[in-house]
């Protein structure tokens, strides 16, 4: 029996770019005279079945269906192939398609039409979204996270993937990698299948800058590539305190009134060459 070759994906989404991969399970054969010829045909469901959530029923009223597009017949010797790919199909985006196979043995006897499951054809890549690098995992779940300019960790990069979408076959996976300031990759590509919070393991150096590159794939195997908007600098060292003094010592001669909440006051100077000083307490 014929079926679509889903490669681990949903069977309704594997057709793209005018080709359809078919898995005939154990193949079609005749133990006496062998399979000498296979006829194939392509069927397109009516417009009432448009959309991925409306698959047609297994069989139609007329069998085999009257509206079939014949495909080139194929000569075989003894046994039909278990897997094959049919190219240059005139398929319609967003419509359900299936292939029917008819086998003829060595003495001309014809097997019944064997249909594959219906496959929704998706010929468009996903809608590009945004890859936002954040400093903490909590920031990834905020309503409108801002792009980080610096991060202190060298072992992980936290990010959230927003607004990636595919109306036809849906989002399948995200292939993530880091690229340096020169555009060359600085990490291996890894695959994730979620987008709210991604914890990407890396090995970064102090002062190393990077961007995130995303290849977003839908279930039909089509993809869109996105690079994060900002370049992030790794700052793995704390700020430097250059001067600490209490008022009243050295050149600072001030009269202070002690109170219950004030014992002494200090002055300090701090700087950070990489990411700057964000706050003083």
Question: Predicted segment positions?
Answer:
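Low-complexity, disordered linker/stalk regions enriched in Pro/Thr/Ser/Gly
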Residues: 1-281
């Amino acid at each position: 029996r014929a079926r679509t070759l889903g490669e681990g994906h949903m069977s309704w989404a594997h057709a793209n770019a005018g080709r359809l991969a078919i898995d005939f399970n154990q193949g079609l054969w005749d133990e006496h005279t062998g399979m000498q010829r296979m006829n194939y045909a392509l069927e397109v469901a009516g417009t009432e079945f448009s959309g991925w959530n409306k698959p047609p029923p297994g069989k139609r009223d007329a069998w085999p269906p009257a509206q079939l597009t014949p495909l080139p017949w194929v000569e075989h010797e003894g046994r039909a192939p278990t897997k094959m790919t049919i190219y240059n199909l005139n398929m319609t985006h967003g419509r359900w398609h299936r292939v029917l196979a008819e086998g003829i043995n060595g003495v001309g006897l014809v097997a019944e039409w064997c249909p594959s499951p219906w496959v929704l054809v998706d010929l468009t890549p996903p809608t590009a979204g945004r890859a936002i690098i954040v400093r903490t995992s909590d920031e990834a779940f905020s309503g409108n996270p801002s792009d980080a300019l610096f991060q202190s960790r060298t072992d992980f990069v936290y990010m959230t993937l927003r607004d990636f979408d595919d109306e036809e076959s849906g989002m399948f996976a995200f292939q993530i990698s880091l690229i340096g300031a020169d555009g060359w990759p600085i990490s291996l590509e890894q695959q994730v299948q979620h987008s709210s919070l991604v914890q990407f393991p890396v090995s970064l150096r102090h002062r190393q800058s990077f961007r995130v590159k995303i290849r977003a794939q839908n279930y039909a195997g089509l993809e869109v590539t996105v690079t994060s908007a900002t370049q992030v600098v790794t700052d793995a060292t704390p700020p430097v305190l250059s001067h600490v003094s209490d008022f009243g010592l050295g050149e600072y001669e001030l009269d202070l009134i002690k109170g219950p909440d004030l014992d002494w006051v200090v002055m300090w100077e701090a700087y950070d060459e990489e990411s700057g000083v964000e706050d003083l307490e």
